[in-house]
Amino acid sequence: MSKAPPLRLGVNIDHIATLRNARGGRHPDPLRAAFAAIEAGADGITAHLREDRRHIRDADMQRLKAEISKPLNFEMAATDDMIRIALGVKPHAVCLVPERREELTTEGGLDVVGQQASLGPAIARFNDAGIRTSLFIAADPAQIETAAKLKAPAIEIHTGAWCDAITDGDAAKANTEWQRIFAGAALARSAGLEVHAGHGLDYATAETISELPQIVELNIGFHMIGEALFVGLGETVRAMRAAMDRGRAKAIAA
């Protein structure tokens, strides 16, 4: 049997911008963090331009697109304003996510089933512009099937509930959530979708999920930025890459 396809690491730099914005000014610079992550082995950079601009700002996206040597993944809500901005930036990819101003971080997956009327045209516009679109969704069959129906090239499976259950020591819930991810990744791949995953991943959970051969990209940020305070960003990227490689070595294509 053949080995699983290569697994990409997208490093999310949002919380470098969170730290910068705590005092204002330009330091620490998210672009510098992107350079460091790429030098350490990141395959791409992810940044979320939220409507309230709480961390990443418009100018950050422009600078990232202009200056980094790896693909830029532009996370965004599917609003008219954000679509306009993304089409102007022309990133390699966009990831459409749900967004509420009162949340601390993205709390759940996108309701693709309930928002087909607005998401379909947005996906079509990005496809026409040559920008790969992924939809950040729970590993739910109806959501996955609708994503394929809308001709989204990719999905990103929300791993937060699984990671939270592991952190909370709830083995039963963790197993239930893992089975959903396992089945969802297989269903998405069989539907012709490229499969990514992210949210709440640390070294251990990244290693585990890397065993799933259908998944070709992980987008990870908060854990690595937190660890970087103690050991440096380059070291955290290398450690995450090593964890993913250990998991991938156990995976073989079905």
From Swiss-Prot:
Q: Report keywords, A-Z.
A: Cytoplasm, Pyridoxine biosynthesis, Transferase
Q: Which residues form a coiled coil?
A: none
Picking any one GO biological process from the record gives: pyridoxine biosynthetic process
Give the principal location in a single coarse category.
cytoplasm
Q: Which CDD domains match?
A: PNPsynthase (cd00003)
The molecular function terms in GO held by this entry are: pyridoxine 5'-phosphate synthase activity
Q: Where in the cell is it found?
A: Cytoplasm
Assembly mode: Homooctamer; tetramer of dimers.
Its family remark reads:
Belongs to the PNP synthase family.
Recorded protein name is Pyridoxine 5'-phosphate synthase
Look up and give the organism this protein is from: Rhodopseudomonas palustris (strain TIE-1)
